[in-house]
Amino acid sequence: MVDIILFRCLGQLHFTQGRNHILLNGRPLHLRGTVENAVFPKTGHAPVCDAEWERIMRIVKDYGLNHIRFHSWCPPAAAFRMADRHGVYLEVEMPMWGKDAEPDEARYDFFRREMRAILKEYGNHPSFVLYCNGNEITGNFDFIEELTADGRKLDTRHLYSGSTARTRVPSDQYYVSQQTNKGPVKVYEGRPSTDWDRSKESDVDVPVISHESGQRCVYPDFREIGKYTGPVEARNFELWREMLTANGMGDQAHDFFRASGALTVVEYKAVIEALLRSSKSAGFQLLSLNDFPGQGYAPVGVLDPFWDLSLIHISEPTRPEPIS
């Protein structure tokens, strides 16, 4: 006789909506997150094995973050399992972006079925805290409200939002945005200081999470070209290297990378500290901890697209003391 032991992940977590914060078991939770843009150059698709997602979750925690927003996509089961294991809170979305909510009944039916499938398949994971329909949506917001309200009725274990960074809907339980009706909550500019924050702008009727904070670009590191060994090639890097060489500055490429990278780290520090000072901020989502080689090219991370340590660092990150 063979004994078969089945393991199922269970979590004794209770997430609720507070005035300014998401509450975890009744206590305010400040989300410190990064945006995951489905960037996997080695394979061209998201990993489905536990090992790779465990690596990503460990990196996220090593940098003092506790949250990942999956930008207009839902990750595979392995991501949820490893987030459960390492205590990373997830925002999950459908593949809805921009004009996807324009009138189209066939598309609407797909989104209704997709939302139900996500909640049914992954709803039991304690790491699945936030659900949002998608990114910067425009179009028919009556449909967005329908989806959001239906989600709240179907599964009360999560908090729901209609869209990031655009129109609010009545069923929103949190709001990811760069701006509220009281002003900007994302820090793009400001004189160097230690006292400015975004408390006033974040003080609305639902918790506000700063949308895609950061976006400070670093000069490309052409040494990354050799890492693109899969279906994705760094043709853009090759063109930029040729242009720099043609203009007589090819030997300065690494200096440009180091200088812009050092400035980016300083700017990210200022942005994060301002949001941490904002007592009424529910959190932030960086764009992003790793570079985003899509939608053009956005080298906005302190890690490269492979989640590897970028050479702009002086030293390895030090794991901070555990905080919620």
Language-model segment annotations:
Residues 302-310:
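Short, low-complexity, polybasic intrinsically disordered segments
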Residues 1-60:
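N-terminal carbohydrate-binding accessory modules
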Residues 1, 80-83, 314:
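Hydrophobic alpha-helical segments that mediate membrane insertion or helix-helix packing
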Residues 63:
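Active-site charged/polar residues at nucleotide-handling catalytic sites that mediate phosphoryl
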Residues 312-313, 317-324:
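Single conserved hydrophobic/aromatic residue that forms the stacking wall/gate
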Residues 57-59, 67-291, 296-303:
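Substrate-binding/catalytic cleft of secreted carbohydrate-active enzymes
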